[in-house]
């Protein structure tokens, strides 16, 4: 099988610096040696525009960005201004994928009114993004307050926002007690990017301050692990996605990893093994 490009979250690079005591440049070059050359970046991290040259000097580019919005509650003018400035910054870095975290529905909200407003702002963002050749995406965000945390929720947005695409986070459907494999079958036609996230129930995956566990909707605690080291079934999902024609980046994600560099290395090794 063809080996897709590998991306890693920039936050993991920074976490690895704190864990290892190494400089950012040293960690990036170590990640490069594992096979990564893309970065998934929280947009605010890119406000210092000198990062573009720094990343390039280390052998990296920005493969995707993500940013949080509150489309369901913010004033329309404010949302549009934030959309425009966000897209301009993403375009400066050459990012072609933009994951919009569109906001949440709270207990006392008029749920349908908030979702309708989200759809309107996402439609505007998709239209604006076309000017830069950027694809706007939603993901299966692992929070019950996100109306796009489930397969059915995502299907609603995909069907009601023309041109909106899907970032398939392989590990987030587990939060909602849904099967990632079944989600892939239903949403495959919308996928434009993949976050390769695995989950583990193994408490040995806890970090030093026991802050990296996340409860699924049943209350069971999930821990981050290297891609391919947990129970999600990463190998089968990724093999099928590539066989079905997915040729984009595989973005390794394991926020809160007890040892970010080790997990990056193991994730890259596993993905190369799966796609031999």
Question: Predicted segment positions?
Answer:
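N-terminal pre-domain/capping segments
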Residues: 1-96, 163-165, 201, 268-276
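Residues at the N-termini of beta-strands
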Residues: 38, 97, 193, 248-249
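Surface-exposed, active-site-proximal loop segments in enzymatic domains
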Residues: 67-83, 102-115, 217-221
């Amino acid at each position: 099988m063809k080996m897709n490009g590998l991306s890693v979250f920039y936050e993991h690079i920074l976490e690895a610096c704190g864990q290892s005591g190494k400089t950012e440049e040293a960690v990036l070059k170590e990640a490069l040696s594992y096979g990564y050359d893309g970065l998934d970046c929280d947009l605010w991290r890119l406000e210092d525009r000198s990062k573009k040259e720094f990343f390039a000097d280390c052998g990296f580019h920005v493969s995707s960005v993500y940013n949080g919005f509150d489309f369901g509650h913010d004033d329309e003018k404010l949302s549009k201004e934030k959309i425009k400035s966000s897209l301009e910054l993403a375009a400066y870095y050459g990012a072609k994928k933009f994951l919009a975290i569109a906001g949440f529905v709270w207990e006392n909200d008029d749920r349908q009114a908030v979702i309708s407003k989200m759809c309107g702002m996402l439609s505007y963002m998709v239209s604006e993004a076309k000017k830069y050749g950027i694809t706007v995406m939603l993901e299966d965000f692992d929070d019950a307050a996100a109306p796009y945390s489930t397969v059915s929720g995502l299907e609603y947005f995909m069907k009601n926002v023309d041109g909106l695409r899907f970032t398939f986070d392989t590990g987030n459907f587990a939060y909602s007690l849904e099967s990632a494999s079944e989600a892939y079958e239903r949403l495959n036609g919308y996928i434009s990017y993949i976050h390769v996230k695995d989950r583990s129930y193994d408490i040995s995956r806890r970090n030093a301050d026991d802050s990296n566990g996340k409860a699924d909707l049943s209350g069971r605690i999930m821990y981050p692990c290297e891609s391919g080291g947990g129970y999600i079934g990463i190998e089968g999902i990724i093999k099928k996605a590539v066989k079905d024609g997915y040729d984009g980046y595989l973005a390794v994600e394991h926020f809160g990893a007890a040892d970010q560099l080790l997990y990056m290395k193991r994730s890259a090794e596993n993905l190369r093994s799966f796609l031999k």
